Design a protein with these regions (language model features):
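Short coil-to-beta-strand
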Residues: 84-95
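Basic/polar, cationic surfaces and motifs that engage anionic cell-wall
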Residues: 4, 84, 98-99, 103-164
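Structured loop/turn residues at beta-strand edges in well-structured enzyme cores
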Residues: 21, 88, 128
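N-terminal catalytic cores of peptidoglycan-degrading enzymes
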Residues: 1-84
Length: 164
């Protein structure tokens, strides 16, 4: 299933490329900002030192922020099984949502449709195990809540995105 993206590169990423076989995980996030505009501003501000590989906007548009073979700075201090600092082994997908601090909403149907298309493509391209599709809260539970309880994990699992 093909997906279309626009480009709005973030300056915050590791300049050294990784190998395709190093990508083992997909990590889902919500932006946690008051507005989509504020989220994009933060993700494209060098001083923020945060980024993601993809951003899915409220209307379902997918924006490439950091190309897949570059390491985006989305996971921070993180741990999953034998992996630490998951940035180097994962693709980070931010989904526009104000999050718990700013009136956490359901994710739009357009966002979920785009997330399914993008995730299926990444799973196939990088041979990602469905058990390695995680939320930020899974890999950093002491400090992160996203993508949160309104994230449709069960629905995505029925679409072969993740595990329920």
């Amino acid at each position: 299933m093909a997906y279309k993206t626009s480009l709005n590169y973030s300056p915050s990423f590791d300049s050294k490329k990784r190998k395709k076989n190093q990508i083992k995980f997909i990590i889902f996030h919500y932006t946690g900002m008051k507005s989509e505009k504020a989220a994009i501003k933060r993700l494209t501000d060098f001083k923020s030192e945060v980024s993601c590989n993809y951003l899915i906007k409220k209307n379902g548009d997918i924006v490439t922020m950091v190309p897949d073979l570059y390491i985006s700075w989305h996971a921070g201090k993180s741990l999953w099984k034998k992996y630490q600092s998951l940035n180097k082994n994962s693709i980070g997908i931010e989904i526009t949502n104000p999050g718990h601090r700013h009136g956490y909403n359901r994710f739009s149907n357009s966002q979920i449709r785009s997330l399914i298309k993008l995730s299926r493509s990444l799973i196939k391209k990088y041979k990602i195990n469905l058990k390695n599709i995680l939320g930020h809260s899974d890999i950093a539970p002491e400090r992160k809540k996203d993508p949160g309880e309104k994230f449709p994990w069960e629905y995505l699992a029925k679409k072969n995105i993740g595990f329920w």
